[in-house]
């Protein structure tokens, strides 16, 4: 078993917590020292101007993390079988439904 941790940091940048104006931008900080700029997924429920332009949203991160795990598993199997892989590319697609 392994343990994985991250730190999530958000700071209020508006005077009030008005649902129409508070910033959704935050940071994911990892033990490796990497910091990722994150925010909400832009969409009809999120007011314009509250989401950073150069950010990753949690939903995209889940899709990328699952695809990354799949790739690492594939590469490990290939290496154990003595296969040489020169390039790997994936275009994962995730769908979240409200039911």
Kindly give the residue locations of the regions a language model identified:
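Extended beta-strand/beta-hairpin segments
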Residues: 1-64, 72-99
């Amino acid at each position: 078993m392994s343990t994985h941790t991250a730190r999530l940091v958000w700071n209020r940048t508006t005077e009030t917590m008005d649902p129409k104006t508070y910033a959704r931008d935050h940071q994911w900080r990892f033990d490796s020292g990497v910091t990722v700029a994150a925010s909400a997924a832009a969409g009809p429920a999120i007011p314009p101007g509250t989401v950073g332009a150069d950010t990753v949203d949690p939903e995209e991160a889940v899709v990328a993390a699952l695809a990354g795990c799949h790739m690492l598993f594939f590469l490990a199997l290939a290496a154990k079988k003595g296969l040489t892989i020169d390039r790997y590319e994936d275009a994962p697609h995730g769908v979240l439904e409200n039911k």
